[in-house]
Structures are given as structure tokens and as C-alpha cells.
């Protein structure tokens, strides 16, 4: 006689089988234990040392993945045999978790709360609509028997089975057996979440495009105002250019400094007539004018005598 533990539906059933294999008697029905995925997820979220990456929500009825890259790289390999965040989200969807906020990864389930680990057994996998259709025979028996003690769950890991569906079941460590239909059961929720994120991005893109169009219009209005209301600077006229040339023909800077430095003859220099910077009257001219004046006076006196 041997005690056999098998998983049927959502319960652990302990069976007692005789050596001849003719009759099997059910000894007891054990309360269903939570799925390994749920237990590990609860342990991962409840760890206070990783609150900067994943933590409980404000009401402690949700949990938030604050930094998905670090969550997938550093935390997932410690609890699961993969580091794929998308696969983790798909598994949450298969157990009825929903994404409640569009702009962050916050998930909720009515039986997944802080301090209520006993409620995890109330969370079950979703039944896919394709389960009613006939399925091909699995690559390994659906019910695996383990000769263990009466209430001990299996503790030693199994070797990876062969086959696509079996490999998926071993990869995520959800149950002892799985099928491709169950694995893809939560794809609709993930698609809805991604569609909502896509709509948010499109809305933000439209807002940025409208702001860009407004800035372009403002820029064009400023250019139009400057062209129609601001007069351009006129070029210098020809007279100004000519005066500049006459200034260049004037006395040199050295002569000006010498004339300014001379203490006497300032008034004479100012009254003197110049041509191209050269004085037309000098000392010889003064003497000549004095001689002419004296001759004129002599002529006047002779005429009077």
C-alpha cells in the first residue's frame, strides 16, 4: 500500500493505492495550496529591501513595479528561472491581475493584499475558451504521482520535460502540468494594456505637434511684424563720403599737435587763411603790407604840401 498525492482541479487529493492496483480509496481532501507563482510573487513584493523597485501600493491592495528594467534584471532571476518582464505580466494576467493605472505598472487582484497571504489560495488560473475543444495528448501524463509523506508538497525540482507545452510549464513553475492554451489565456488583457499605452502616447504626440504649430505661427508673425514696421538702416549718402575725403586732405595730425602746443600765435593761426593746410600770409607778407602803407602815407603828405 502506498500514499499518493495528486493535483486535481484546484485541490490536492491524497490517494491510497493497494499493491495489487485493483482499488483506490480517497483518504482526505486537502485545502488547495496557492500556486508557486503566486507565493513567489507575494514574497517578492513583500520584501522591504526592494521597495525602490517593487512595493505595495498606497492602500496595500495593489503592488507597483517602479523600475521594470531593474526588476527583470535583478529580482526575477532570484524567484523564477527567467528575467523576462513581459512573461511575468502575462502570468499575472492568467491569474486575474489587472493593470489599474495607464502610466505605470500597478497591478491588483481582490485576493492579493498585504498581510493576507492565506487568500492566495482563492486565486485561480483563468479558463481559456479553447479548453473546451479537444486537445492533442500531452507529451507526458497529466497526473504525476509522487510517493511523499501525507501532507508534504514536493520539494525537489524536476528535470525539464520534453515538448513545447511542458517546457512552458517548467519555465514558469506554475503547476505540474500545463497547455499552450492556458499559457496564452491572458494575452487579451496584455494587449488591452498595451493599446491603452499606445493611445496615451498618440495623445501626447498630438499635443506636441499642436504646440509646435503654434510656435511656428508665432515665429512667422514676428518676422512679418519686423518686415513691415521696422525701417531698415539707410546707407551713408555721397555727401558724407565726400566730407570724409576732405577731412583726409586736411593737415596731418602731427601739424595739429604742433600748432596746439605752440604758446603764441593762436589767434593769428585761427585768423590766417590756409590752402590745403598751408598759411597764405607769413612774415614777409606782413612786411610788404607795412611798406605799402608807408608809401601811401607819403604820397598823401606830398599832395597836401
Swiss-Prot record:
Region Disordered, residue ranges: 286-305
GO BP annotation list: regulation of transcription by RNA polymerase II
Annotated organism of origin: Oryza sativa subsp. japonica (Rice)
Family as reported in the entry's similarity comment: Belongs to the HSF family. Class B subfamily.
Compositionally biased tracts (Acidic residues): 294-305
UniProt keyword annotation of DNA-binding present: yes
The organism's place on the tree of life at top rank: Eukaryota
InterPro entries xrefs: HSF_DNA-bd, WH-like_DNA-bd_sf, WH_DNA-bd_sf
GO molecular function, one term: DNA-binding transcription factor activity
Signal peptide: none
Keyword Transcription: yes
Modification(s) after translation: Exhibits temperature-dependent phosphorylation.
Motif annotated as Nuclear localization signal, chain positions: 286-289
Keyword annotations of the record: DNA-binding, Nucleus, Phosphoprotein, Stress response, Transcription, Transcription regulation
Localization: Nucleus
Assigned GO CC terms: nucleus
Purpose of the protein: Transcriptional regulator that specifically binds DNA of heat shock promoter elements (HSE).
Protein name, as recorded: Heat stress transcription factor B-4d
Subunit annotation: Homotrimer.
Domain notes: The hydrophobic-rich region (HR-A/B) corresponds to the oligomerization domain.
Region (Hydrophobic repeat HR-A/B): 201-230
Main location (coarse class): nucleus
Amino acid at each position: 500500500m502506498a500514499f499518493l498525492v495528486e493535483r486535481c482541479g484546484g485541490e490536492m487529493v491524497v490517494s491510497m493505492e493497494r499493491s495489487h492496483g485493483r482499488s483506490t480509496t480517497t483518504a482526505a481532501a486537502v485545502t488547495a495550496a496557492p500556486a508557486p507563482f503566486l507565493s513567489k510573487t507575494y514574497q517578492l513584493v513583500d520584501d522591504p529591501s526592494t521597495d525602490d523597485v517593487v512595493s505595495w501600493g498606497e492602500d496595500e491592495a495593489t503592488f507597483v513595479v517602479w523600475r521594470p528594467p531593474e526588476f527583470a534584471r535583478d529580482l526575477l532571476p532570484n524567484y523564477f528561472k527567467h528575467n523576462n518582464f513581459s512573461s511575468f505580466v502575462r502570468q499575472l494576467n492568467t491569474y486575474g491581475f489587472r493593470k489599474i493605472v495607464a502610466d505605470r505598472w500597478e497591478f491588483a487582484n481582490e485576493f492579493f493584499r498585504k498581510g493576507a497571504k492565506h487568500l492566495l489560495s482563492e486565486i485561480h488560473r483563468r479558463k481559456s475558451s479553447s479548453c473546451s475543444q479537444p486537445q492533442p495528448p500531452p507529451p507526458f501524463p497529466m497526473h504525476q504521482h509522487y510517493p511523499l509523506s501525507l501532507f508534504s508538497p514536493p520539494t525537489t525540482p524536476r528535470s525539464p520535460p520534453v515538448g513545447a507545452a511542458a517546457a512552458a510549464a517548467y519555465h514558469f513553475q506554475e503547476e505540474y502540468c500545463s497547455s499552450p492554451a492556458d499559457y496564452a489565456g491572458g494575452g487579451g488583457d496584455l494587449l488591452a494594456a498595451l493599446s491603452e499605452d499606445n493611445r496615451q502616447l498618440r495623445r501626447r504626440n498630438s499635443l506636441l505637434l499642436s504646440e509646435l504649430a503654434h510656435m511656428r505661427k508665432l515665429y512667422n508673425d514676428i518676422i512679418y511684424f519686423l518686415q513691415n514696421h521696422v525701417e531698415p538702416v539707410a546707407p551713408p549718402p555721397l555727401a558724407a563720403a565726400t566730407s570724409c575725403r576732405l577731412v583726409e586732405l586736411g593737415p596731418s595730425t602731427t601739424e595739429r599737435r604742433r600748432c596746439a602746443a605752440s604758446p603764441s600765435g593762436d589767434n593769428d593761426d585761427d585768423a590766417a587763411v590756409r590752402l590745403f593746410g598751408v598759411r597764405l600770409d607769413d612774415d614777409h607778407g606782413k612786411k610788404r603790407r607795412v611798406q605799402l602803407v608807408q608809401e601811401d602815407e607819403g604820397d598823401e603828405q606830398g599832395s597836401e604840401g
